[in-house]
């Protein structure tokens, strides 16, 4: 097993250019595929999730050209759905941002497809999306356990009509449905069952669809209407914003041990909800400065917060480890969907926080963190989850430092993370 030792860091300062957003990269690749014309995507994220999407698109006959550093992709759109004359099996690793949209997109055309992934992917639910696609006439079946990949799709096109989809587990199901709806045979009316989680991620989807020329009627996130007969048209160029969830670690570093840390590639013009992480740091006492495409975080004495963080589920994880350096008990609420991510993040976070001495209360959909008088060093298990590894790098600001087990799991979104993190140390 690989281990990375992070020695205590007394002060951080510097500037980090954030790699492209995973959410935006994979959405934009799929829309560019379905669109008419050639799209040039810049600042594309170079990571496992994106590589699985690109490999699948290539297997399905999509033509694209990647720059040497894999961050610029020129992709020739199909001006319509993906088709396959022979049966295709696509392996998608643990990439939810590839599995869910492709599952929906492959119901639009003609062909037989099997979607598989790593063992953890077989534990990540997809039933709500499959139920919705079946309501629109899709033929999707489970190859192992009901409600989970691997999946088999026999596609002859998507009918359209009225569809209900649960909104309380993952916004990725709705995102997948929205992106394919314009290419259905009839209008699609989507009714949301329950409270929609992670609304800002839906805003990303709608903003990108608009960039590719498709209009969606959003009725206050309770229902959505997508008219048939629309088509995606390439805007020519798409700049992928920096990943706001990835920015959270550097902003937290500035708040805990700054100095001044500036992240570029995200800012007040960002379409990602996770930039609101900076507002949480501000509530904890950090000094935050916003530009159109940058955020600056400066250190201060931090105090605990008690907040509903459903709108920033990924970045909220960083608050759990930042809480180790704040006075009082921090409560992070309404985060049930942590449990269905790369690992059960609520259980994993509670376990690892206790290792360093924190007093933790883990509930069904919340976590409370009280720092100890003195933090202990530990070897942190990362559960093949990139965000666990990056969150616990904050422990480098304790006097004891920290050891991260299997740090290479950051390759899912940020292969160069620890080099960038160490570049801020002074």
UniProtKB/Swiss-Prot annotation:
It is found in: Cytoplasm. It holds the Pfam family EPSP_synthase. It is an enzyme of class 2 (transferase). GO terms for biological process: amino acid biosynthetic process; aromatic amino acid family biosynthetic process; chorismate biosynthetic process. Coiled coil: none annotated. The keyword Transferase applies. InterPro entries: Enolpyruvate_Tfrase_dom, Enolpyruvate_Tfrase_sf, EPSP_synthase, EPSP_synthase_CS, RNA3'P_cycl/enolpyr_Trfase_a/b. The active site is at residue 314. Its EC number is 2.5.1.19. Phosphoenolpyruvate binds at residues 22, 96, 124, 172, 345, 387, 412. Monomer. This is 3-phosphoshikimate 1-carboxyvinyltransferase. It comes from Shewanella pealeana (strain ATCC 700345 / ANG-SQ1). The lineage of its organism: Bacteria, Pseudomonadati, Pseudomonadota, Gammaproteobacteria, Alteromonadales.
């Amino acid at each position: 097993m690989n281990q990375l030792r992070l020695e205590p860091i007394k002060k951080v300062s510097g500037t980090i250019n954030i790699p492209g957003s995973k959410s935006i990269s994979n959405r934009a690749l799929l829309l560019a595929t379905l669109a008419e014309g050639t799209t040039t995507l810049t600042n594309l994220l170079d990571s496992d999730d994106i590589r699985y999407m690109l490999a699948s698109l290539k297997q399905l006959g999509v033509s694209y050209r990647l720059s040497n550093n894999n961050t610029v992709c020129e992709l020739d759109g199909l001006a319509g759905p993906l088709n396959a004359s022979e049966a295709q099996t696509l392996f998608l690793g643990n990439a939810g941002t590839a599995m869910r949209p492709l599952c929906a997109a492959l119901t639009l055309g003609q062909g037989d497809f099997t979607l598989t992934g790593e063992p953890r992917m077989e534990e990540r639910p997809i039933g709500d999306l499959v139920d919705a696609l079946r309501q629109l006439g899709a033929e999707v079946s489970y190859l192992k356990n009901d409600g989970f990949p691997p999946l088999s799709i026999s596609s002859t096109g998507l009918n359209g009509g009225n569809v209900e989809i649960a909104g309380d587990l993952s916004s990725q199901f709705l995102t997948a449905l929205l992106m394919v709806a314009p290419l259905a045979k009839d209008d699609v009316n989507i009714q949301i069952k329950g409270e929609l989680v992670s609304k800002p991620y839906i805003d990303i989807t709608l903003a990108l669809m608009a960039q590719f020329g498709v209009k969606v009627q959003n009725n206050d996130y309770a229902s959505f209407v997508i008219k048939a007969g629309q088509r995606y048209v390439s805007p020519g160029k798409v700049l992928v914003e920096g990943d706001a969830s990835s920015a959270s670690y550097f902003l937290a570093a500035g708040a805990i041990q700054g100095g001044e840390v500036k992240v570029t590639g995200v800012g007040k013009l960002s379409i990602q909800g996770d930039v609101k992480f900076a507002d949480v740091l501000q509530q904890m006492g950090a000094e935050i400065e916003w530009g159109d495409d940058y955020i600056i975080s400066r250190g201060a004495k931090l105090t605990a917060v008690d907040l509903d963080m459903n709108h920033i589920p990924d970045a909220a994880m960083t608050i759990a480890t930042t809480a180790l350096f704040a006075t009082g008990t921090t409560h992070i609420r309404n985060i049930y969907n942590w449990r269905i991510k790369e690992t059960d993040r609520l259980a994993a976070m509670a376990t690892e926080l206790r290792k360093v001495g924190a007093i933790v209360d883990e509930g069904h959909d919340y976590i409370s963190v009280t720092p100890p008088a003195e933090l202990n060093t530990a070897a942190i298990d990362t559960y093949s989850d990139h965000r666990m590894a990056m969150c616990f790098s904050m422990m480098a600001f304790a006097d004891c430092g920290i050891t991260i087990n299997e740090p290479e799991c950051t390759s899912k979104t940020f292969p160069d993370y620890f080099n960038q993190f160490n570049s801020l140390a002074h």
